Amino acid sequence: MPRQHAIEDYRNFGIMAHIDAGKTTTTERILYYTGKSHKIGEVHEGAATMDWMEQEQERGITITSAATTAFWNGKRLNIIDTPGHVDFTIEVERSLRVLDGAVCVLDSNQGVEPQTETVWRQGDKYKVPRIVFANKMDKTGADFFKCLADIVDRLGAKPVAIQLPIGAENNFKGCIDLVTMKAIVWNDESLGAKFDHVEIPAELADQAKEYREKLVEAAVELDDDAMSAYLEGTEPDEATLKRLIRKAVLSGAFYPVLCGSAFKNKGVQPLLDAVVDYLPSPLDVPAIKGTDDKGNEVVRKADDKEPLSLLAFKIMDDPFVGTITFCRIYSGILTSGTGVVNSTREKKERIGRMLLMHANNREDIKEAYAGDIVALAGLKEARTGDTLCDPNNQVILEKMEFPEPVIEIAIEPKSKADQEKLGIALAKLAAEDPSFRVSTDHESGQTILKGMGELHLDIKVDILKRTYKVDANIGAPQVAFRERITKPANVDYTHKKQTGGTGQFAAVSLVVEPNEPGGGYVFESKIVGGAVPKEYIPGVEKGIESVLGAGVVAGFPVVDVKVALVDGKYHDVDSSALAFEIASRAAFREALQKGKSVLLEPIMKVEVVTPEDYTGSVIGDLNSRRGQIQGQDMRGNANVINAMVPLMNMFGYVNNLRSMSQGRATFTMQFSHYAEAPANVSAEVQKKFA
């Protein structure tokens, strides 16, 4: 079957925002107006089409980014709904990785919120072209112009209004389109499906003229001819202005800002027009780079004629189809039944069912093309971030980076039957979400779950209980401490064992030094002249790595350390890889002692938004949690307090804050860095764990 839509008519975009800015509602309206949903789903009724896991419908937040295809004005929209809660930042990160553009949704009452900053920075990291939608214009306190100011102050970006609101709060009627200089007013009776283009209301004419000028001036700066014409008194026509706004979006010169109220069905159709007019097609963004099987850099252009390459960006377990792998096809054509190679894992796979997803409905397809986002059923080996490609033209596309988890809980199944179910369920959950890790504590035999925050782990436990029917006891959350050495250490160690027959002999000299923060573990062999034969060096590495998982302070993983093997001795008969493994293990443990290992604890960046009356109590409480206040500023009539606080002092903070502020203060927290724990904390942790 030939391609139905030319690749320049594709818009692969995500909707990103802070929690509760109305992202899922905006997506729902998009699906409704593009004719994909016959009934609008409301988030607060737990009926939104995109939020299809029970946990999402109950909590009214979006956890997994479902991919949906819709059509508008002859263009094909592939929409990825991303979560706005800080514990699910990983979902946003991997969505942005496969998108070409994004709509950033703001709550007009709140402006730019902490998680907006986080997702915006992720957008900057992947250079994603963006447009901004100031939503909830019908809410009390909605202020479109505050949103514009916030984008400058908090995101350091240049916003340009391409619409202005007509009225606000209860009187929000519609918007003025500054490109066409017409007003758009929605008809309340038709669920927003009908609207009229009318003249700009007289009382807003001056304001519209002022902001139209700002828009034109920002746009003509991007084109010499348009600039010359403008200076001579000729304004750009509508087509030229749209072309220049598109150019600005693609280059990040400025970000067009629109307004509306998705919940009240106002402003969604012009937002869709803006997605089509201004966001990039796969041809407008740089072609993806990768490395071929010889390690050379190669480029895969968005073209059906190029060799096949696709990236798995999400894995989900579907009750009807089994494992579904969401993939973005970057180049070539994918046909069901063909063989591909998972070049990341060097495994062959056969493409079985191919599905086009609409939230949680699905349509079987036989072929997919460059630019498509498809769901593949039944892949056995694929994990998030893997590349699948043509076996004869192998490539590994740019890898995704995933953050380290900072919080962990122990989980114990209640019965033998639960034990088996738990193993299967955890393997599936870990495959779906790379920021969720599962490990076993060798000493206690407990299963440990690690994640990005309390909510992240709460939801995983909830899925285990509901979806997989596992009955288990859950331990209290624990902090993921780390250890590192603070000074260099040199160690010589000899391992000897003579017990008749073949003995064991190995001698190693290690130089162990601190690496810079975030530098990780680095091993280097500086052996010259065969003091330790090549075949034994992997044994040395294995011995060192066996200690990295449990350091000498309190048995936590060792990070940021450089180890060099500088000398050694061996015996022709008695030496073996195992003997060198034992020797290097003991030598490295000794080096960790000598190098004055210390305990590191995760420090969280905390932002509290509180009415002014409670500021003193909030700051006092953060100080009592060993928090360091970084600064305060006013946002509207609320005070915003930024602090760095150790994670171990933040458990249960949500309830404390609620009672301290009568439920009026809110906070967000995300991992910032690891820092050395004070001596008293270290002693307490050692007593508990060592």
Curated annotation (Swiss-Prot):
Q: Which positions, given as ranges, span the membrane?
A: none
For the keyword Metal-binding, the answer is no
InterPro entries on file: EFG_II (IPR041095), EFG_III (IPR009022), EFG_III/V (IPR035647), EFG_IV (IPR047872), EFG_V (IPR035649), EFG_V-like (IPR000640), EFTu-like_2 (IPR004161), G_TR_CS (IPR031157)
Domain tr-type G, residue spans: 8-283
Q: Where in the cell is it found?
A: Cytoplasm
Q: Per UniProt, what is one Pfam family of this protein?
A: GTP_EFTU
Is Phosphoprotein set as a keyword in this record? no
Main location per UniProt?
A: cytoplasm
For biological process, the GO terms are: ribosome disassembly
Q: Which residues bind GTP?
A: 17-24, 81-85, 135-138
Q: Which domain of life is it from?
A: Bacteria
Q: Which UniProt keywords apply?
A: Cytoplasm, Elongation factor, GTP-binding, Nucleotide-binding, Protein biosynthesis
What GO cellular-component annotations does this UniProt entry give? cytoplasm
Which terms in the Gene Ontology molecular function aspect does this entry carry? Answer: GTP binding; GTPase activity; guanosine tetraphosphate binding; translation elongation factor activity
**Do you know which CDD domains this protein is assigned to?**
EF-G, EFG_III, EFG_mtEFG1_IV, EFG_mtEFG_C, EFG_mtEFG_II
Cross-referenced HAMAP family: EF_G_EF_2_B
* Functional description taken from the UniProt entry: Catalyzes the GTP-dependent ribosomal translocation step during translation elongation. During this step, the ribosome changes from the pre-translocational (PRE) to the post-translocational (POST) state as the newly formed A-site-bound peptidyl-tRNA and P-site-bound deacylated tRNA move to the P and E sites, respectively. Catalyzes the coordinated movement of the two tRNA molecules, the mRNA and conformational changes in the ribosome.
Q: What family does the entry list? A: Belongs to the TRAFAC class translation factor GTPase superfamily. Classic translation factor GTPase family. EF-G/EF-2 subfamily.
User: What name is this protein filed under?
Assistant: Elongation factor G
Annotated source species: Bradyrhizobium sp. (strain BTAi1 / ATCC BAA-1182)
